[in-house]
Amino acid sequence: ISLASAGESYVLTPGTGSGSSLSYFIPIIDHCLKAKQVDKSPRTRAIVVYPMNALANSQLEELKKFLGADPGTRPVTFGRFTGQESTEEREAMKANPPDILLTNFMMLELLLTRQNAIDQQVIANAKGLKFLVLDELHTYRGRQGADVALLVRRVREALADQLVCIGTS
């Protein structure tokens, strides 16, 4: 938590079920709360990448428990962009970007490369991104690992001057 708060990137290798997501969500939420006091414009400040949609879906439910199920009353907003969303949900995310975007590596790649208006605006809403989290980092091996490494570089180049990268394994 102290590394993330200091703007340092890190990899965390805890045991299964040890609450590793708190090691990145606490500094992300802290940053979002502080940043929103200075700049109230809605934008995505953190992207969390999961290797499987099931993990993103599970984490979405945990965030609802932690931050509140009613989007109108949450101090920090979050949304999922995994390809399972309806056009209406994607349009809503385009118009009202979440502070925290949950996705998978393939959808993040598509967001960066597709030329449709929704995807372009979702990415534009993440300019100035502070955090990029890769959950279950050990699952990206071989060619897929090289693809994800390139994706991290592309995200940094497109969205962030001072990106904090966090990996859990």
Regions found by a protein language model. Give the residues of each.
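N-terminal helicase ATP-binding lobe
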Residues: 1-169
